[in-house]
Amino acid sequence: MPDDTQDVISGGHLVAKALKAEGVERIYTLCGGHIIDIYDGCVDEGIEVVDVRHEQVAAHAADGYARVTGKPGCAVVTAGPGTTDAVTGVANAFRAESPLLLIGGQGALTQHKMGSLQDLPHVDMMTPITKFAATVPDTARAADMVSMAFRECYHGAPGPSFLEIPRDVLDARVPAAKARVPRPGGYRASTRSAGDPEAVEKLADLLVHAEKPAILLGSQVWTTRATEAAVELVRTLNIPAYMNGAGRGTLPPGDPHHFQLSRRYAFSGADVIVIVGTPFDFRMGYGKRLSPDATVVQIDLDYRTVGKNRDIDLGIVGDAGLVLKAVTEAASGRLNGGASKRKEWLDELRAAEQTAIEKRLPHLRSDASPIHPYRLVSEINDFLTEDSIYIGDGGDIVTFSGQVVQPKAPGHWMDPGPLGTLGVGIPFVLAAKQARPDKEVVALFGDGAFSLTGWDFETLVRYDLPFVGIVGNNSSMNQIRYGQKAKYGEARERVGNTLGDVHYDRFAQMLGGYGEEVRDPADIGPALRRARESGKPSLINVWVDPDAYAPGTMNQTMYK
C-alpha cells in the first residue's frame, strides 16, 4: 500500500472510491500489471477482489451479479488479451440488457502508438457492444468518468459500459482537492417513465373488453423489479400469462394464470396480445407467430425495440412496473365486457397445456438408459425449492429444461439471454452464490457448455461456494449435431461436434468438490440430494441419450 496522504490520491484509488460510491461490493478480475493500483484502492475501500481464471468468466460474473441483485456489476481486466478475452461477456450483457462496467488496462499515455505491452484499440472494439466506451485521459478525472460510465449503464434500457485506463493515469497521484468523486444521487436523474397516459388508457380499455387476451412477461419485468405490478395486473384482469428469459418465475407454478406450454396456441387465437419487456427476436419467431387478427401491444424501455420486426397496434415506451401499475389502475372498477367470458379461455388454454404435458409424459417418466433429457430435467424441477436459483448453460439440454423447469420465485431463473452464449454457467453460479449466499444454486450444463469455463469450478472451491451442478453428458454438441444430420445426412452428422466421454464427476473431485456419476434415471434424485448435503461445489455427471433432441432444436429455422 502506498503512503498516500490526505492531500494526494492515485488514479487507482480514485477509481475504487468511485466504485464504492456507486455501491459496488466486489469486482471480478484476472490480475495484470496494468491494473494493480485499482486492487490496492479496492482493499482500502472494502471492495472484495474476486480473482478468476479467465477474463470471460470475470465479465460473465459481473453480468450475473447485476442480474441477481439489480446492483452494478463490475469486472476489471488487464490490457490487450485481458480485454479481448472479456469481449464475449460484455457482448452477452449487451444483448441481455444487463448493466455492468468493464474496466480495462492500457499502456501508458506517454507510450501511445509506440507498441507498448498489450497495446490494442480497446475502445474501438468495445464501442459496438456497449452503451458507453471511453479512455480516461487524466488522473483527476478518473472517478468522474466512472460516474459517466454508470450513468449510461442505467439510462433507458440498461447495458454495459467500458472504460480504458492507461497505466500512468492509474499510477499517478494528484491533489485530492482536484479529484471529484461524484455521488450517484448528485448526478443521476431518474429516467423511469410510466408511458404515455393516452396509450395507457387505451391499453386498459383493450384489456377490459378483450375476450381472449394473453400477456408475455419478458426479462424487463425482472430487471425493472416489476413483479408485483405484473402479478397484480394479471390477477386483477384475469389474463393468462406466459414468461420468458428473466421474466420466468414472475408467477409461481400452480397459479391459475401461469401458463408455459401453450404459448403458440394462445398467440394464434388471442384477440389482444401484450408483449412486455422482450423483443420480437428469434425466440418469438420475429413476431410472425402472433395471430394476424390480434391487437398487438408492446411495452419496452427502448423505443427502438417497439415494433421492430413486426407491426404493432399500440406501443408504449416505459418502465414495465410503472406502466403495468398504471394500466391496472386505469382498468379497475370497469371490469366488464370480455372479462366475464375469460373462464372459458383460461380453461381452453389449460386443456392445451395438459395435452402438451401428456405428449411429453412418456419421456418425463422414462426409465431408459441412456437417460432421456426430459427425465433429467423433470427430476431437476422436482428437486428445486422456493430458495433455488436455477441456471441453464447449454444448447439442446437447456432447451429441454425450458419446457419443464419452473422457478418458484422471480429472479430465480438465469440463462445467457438472446446472444445464446455458452459458458455462462460457472460464472453465473459464482455471482449468484456470492450475491445471495442464503439461496441454493442449481445449475444444469451441457457437456459442451461446461467445457468453455469449467476450470473456474476451482474458483468456486477456493471461495467455498457450494452449489448443485448437473452435466447432461451426451459427448456431443448435440444441438449442432442435429442440424448437420438434418441438412447433410447421418454420414456427416458428427463433423466438428463430437466430444470425448469425459467423467466430469471426477473432474469435480480432482478440484476438491463433490462428484457423482449417474446412468440409471432412478438414481438422479438421490444423487442430487447427496450433492446438496455435501456442502461443496458439485457436479453430477448424467449420461443422457445422444439421439434425443429437444422440439425447440428441431424447429429451428436454420436447420430447415
Question: What residues fall within each predicted segment?
Answer:
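A short, small-residue-rich loop immediately preceding and capping a beta-strand
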Residues: 19, 25-29, 48-50, 68-107, ...
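Active-site diphosphate/adenylate-binding microenvironment
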Residues: 15, 30-33, 38-40, 350-427, ...
